[in-house]
Regions:
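Conserved alpha/beta-hydrolase "nucleophile elbow" surrounding the catalytic nucleophile
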Residues: 31-33, 109-114, 161
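Conserved alpha/beta-hydrolase "acid-adjacent" motif
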Residues: 165-171
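Alpha/beta-hydrolase-fold catalytic nucleophile elbow
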Residues: 59-60, 112, 134-137, 159, ...
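Primarily recognizes the serine-hydrolase "nucleophile elbow" in alpha/beta-hydrolase
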Residues: 99, 107-152
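C-terminal catalytic histidine-bearing segment of alpha/beta-hydrolase fold enzymes
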Residues: 173-215
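Short beta-strand/loop motif that positions the catalytic acidic residue
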Residues: 157-160, 164
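Serine-hydrolase catalytic machinery in alpha/beta-hydrolase-like enzymes
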Residues: 3-104
Length: 215
């Protein structure tokens, strides 16, 4: 049964494994700008059941969103790259709190996000030896962490609609280029006729990615 769970300073919605009692892997999904944890938690039944023993956690971003009274943000969108760089400290804190909470190795955790959550995934995630990173309609705002790429740096799935009028699809091409240049293993799904949203096709791609990269 889903529950509100605080991990470190982050409060979010947690779904324990449905197919097992012991947590052997974890999917963390970060919501977009002006949304909250509930926005991503709807994906738990779809993505969280791919692997036996897999739990699902959707944290709320730490800051209230001025443009959305009930929403949250990872950083002020007016700050662009600088905002993403400053917010990486929050993601570091989140990941380290998760490691402590579940006693899981990074290699059993997938980090993903939608829109601004996808931006944060690509900003902070590459420095960790995670099982994988998934960005839905995101962008690579900063290359600060990419120099830390190693042989065991995580595989990355980029999913984007070609009709996205919020984060243009060119962001996918740009991210792919920079990530591959630094040696990352990147899989790209550019969906025709899809705007700024997560489609069934995108979810199928994410499920396959999770199945391939979580043991």
């Amino acid at each position: 049964m889903a529950e509100i769970k605080k991990i470190g300073k982050f409060e979010g919605i947690y779904q324990p494994p449905i197919k097992a009692d012991e947590v052997t892997s974890l999917i963390i999904l970060l919501h977009g700008w002006g949304a909250d944890a509930a926005d991503m938690f709807g994906l738990a039944p779809i993505l969280g059941q791919v692997k036996q023993g897999c739990a699902f956690y959707a944290p709320n971003a730490p800051y209230p969103c001025a443009a959305s009274p009930h929403g949250r943000e990872w950083f002020d969108i007016q700050q662009g790259e600088n905002g993403a760089i400053m917010a990486m400290d929050d993601l570091d804190e989140l990941l380290n709190s998760v490691f402590d909470e579940f006693s899981l190795p990074a290699s059993q955790i997938i980090l993903g996000g939608f829109s601004q959550g996808g931006m944060m995934t690509l900003a902070a995630g590459p420095a960790y030896e995670l099982a994988g990173l998934i960005s839905f309609s995101g962008a690579l705002l900063t290359e600060q962490r990419l120099a830390e790429a190693t042989v065991s740096s995580p595989p990355i799935l980029l999913i984007h609609g070609d009709l996205d009028d919020v984060v243009p699809a060119t962001a996918l091409i740009d991210a792919q280029s920079h990530l591959e240049e630094k040696g990352y293993d990147v899989e790209v799904v550019l969906e025709k006729g899809i705007g700024h949203s997560i489609s069934e096709t995108g979810l199928d791609s994410a499920r396959h990615f999770i199945d391939s990269h979580l043991s």
